[in-house]
Amino acid sequence: IFEGWCVGARNQKESDLKKGLNKIEKEHDSKLQWRKTVNRYLKNQYKNLFNKIDKLVYLKAPNFNRIFKWRLLQEEKLKLTSKNKKTMSKYKVREFIMFYERITKHMMKDFSKISDLTIFLDNSHRSKKMKFFNK
């Protein structure tokens, strides 16, 4: 099992990279260097890695804001269980997920068409339906 936030992510069309989606992209990547580099890696190196996956299961969140809330909840739980570990503030969590926003939203659009199984999650992180895709 190979698990991760953006496992299986595909590259975007160059034209889709032009408009900054969030504060990080608008203020720190105005020349598109980071976006183009990530996109190139998704198109080449990561594609080669992801092509080795036998079956792809996609856990689809209801929306990107829900992902922020879940990540914040994860941080709050970490705070309770790890007394000596440093955790992120709400601001830092929001900033952290901005780095993954573009890829995540791109995946949310049509990833269920390429995954072998998409599990649609409700706001409470429970499975509400599943969709199998026959390739």
Model region roles, listed by residue range:
Residues C6-K135:
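Conserved NTP phosphate-binding and transfer environment spanning the P-loop NTPase/kinase superfamily
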